[in-house]
Amino acid sequence: IPNGDSIVLVENNALCDSHIVYSYLSNILSQKYNSKIYSYNPNFFNNTFRKLIFYIKIFFLFSYRYIYFSFGVEKNIIPKHNNKNEIEKKFNEVKNKLKSKKDIYDINLKDINVGDLVYDGFLRKYDLPTINFNTKIFEEYLKNFIDLFYFWFDFFSNNKISSVIVSHTVYEFGIVLRLAIKNKIKAYSAGSFFIFSHDEKNNSIF
């Protein structure tokens, strides 16, 4: 059993057919880098009902968490909100630079371009054809995105990550992937019928 201090991060989700691939890939990476395997939730539990259901499933052994434990995952990382004042400050810095919706694509956090993740993620979440960046709903989404980014930025800064496995390279899912790429960490997207390796020239499967 690998006992190093580094971590393989594998996304925690309900994509049952992908779990077999995650199992093999995470264990290969764990052996290669002598790393522990941690799973992670890619987003916050902003919905209290969803959070309650998550823990009820764990209690009654209905959770996919036990599938992850079966292939060596030691713990699951759930994002936590940062200091509100700090996030508000960072949000205002970003928002004040937005003069048109095209500027959204230029959003950079810690020298990482995440504008496309914000743009596409917002449209997907609210099923909208386009963005009005002056609406409260977009501002709340952007603030939440920035909060999530800085949780993962701090996690990468405070832990030794050897590799990451994500389900998607877009929306909020792409945050962990891009942080890994920025830090020269081996990054993969994987599913039931594919495994892609990613770097600075190839941060998406599209």
Task: Locate the predicted segments by residue.
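Beta-rich, aromatic/charged-enriched effector core domains that present basic-aromatic interfaces
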Residues: 165-167, 174, 181-206
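Short N-terminal targeting/anchoring amphipathic segment
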Residues: 3-9, 156-169
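Glycosyltransferases and closely related glycan-assembly transferases
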Residues: 27-31, 156-163, 175-186
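Conserved N-terminal ligand/cofactor-binding loop architecture of enzyme catalytic domains
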Residues: 1-11, 28, 32-146, 192-206
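Well-ordered alpha-helical segments embedded in enzymatic catalytic cores
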Residues: 144-154
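Short alpha-helical
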Residues: 16-17, 171-174
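A short, glycine/small-residue-rich beta-strand->loop->alpha-helix junction that serves as a flexible
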Residues: 11-22
